[in-house]
Amino acid sequence: MAEMVLEVSDLTVRREGVSVVESVSFALAAESDTALVGPNGAGKSTLVQAILGILPHQSGQVRVLGRPLGPKGQLPASVRAQLAYLPQSFSVRNRCPLSVADFVGLGWDPPGLQLPWRGSERRRQAVRQALVKTGCSDLADRLISELSGGQTKRVLLAFCVVRPRRLLVLDEAQAGLDSQAAEQFYGLLFDLRRSEGWTILQVSHDLEMVRLTCDGVLCLNRSLRCSGPPDHALSPAQLERVYGRGYVPYHHHHR
């Protein structure tokens, strides 16, 4: 039986007494790549943040690597160190004076460490390897604030790959990228998932890219409306259930 890296059971999140996410249950097997899709306001980002313990949930349970998320979002440090989260907007970018190499090094440091430190040769070697794996070696001495959107996304993946991790959560990672940069990002993400053994949960509006790259799809509109492989979950009939009548499905393209 496949190992379940993430298990969500009957999760409900309320804001001001209103259910934003209601009774959601699913599980992610090790090394799977699952997309979370749905219309604007469906609760996708809220669900992701509740799973990570950033937002509180009112009922249900989340288990990461077999360990339950505490009532205040607590996870053992050994589990937290195996998670990585790429938010929709990277607000640190424009005010962060760190070089790319120093920023990626923060991904190596123990959770909770507040200041960058250069540490051991092992850490420096891990940073160099992460930059090579993500094609960022030539950016090592650049400031984060000097990077383009596509470069920043690659550096964020270097941050994730600098130490072994099991679960990577992305919230609209393609936001702000043109079609070429988005395709390059997803190609790199696909390669890293296979080489690093990541399990991925990604919020996405790019249904065509989801169809091409993901193993499974969760369709959310406050509650989980359908789930399954892309050919099932992204069929016109299922998309109408999630997005409403009159929704125009994406057009199929082939590489």
Regions found by a protein language model. Name each.
Residues 217-230:
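H-loop (His-switch) and adjacent beta-strand-loop-beta switch element
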Residues 105, 120-139:
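Conserved ABC ATPase "signature" region
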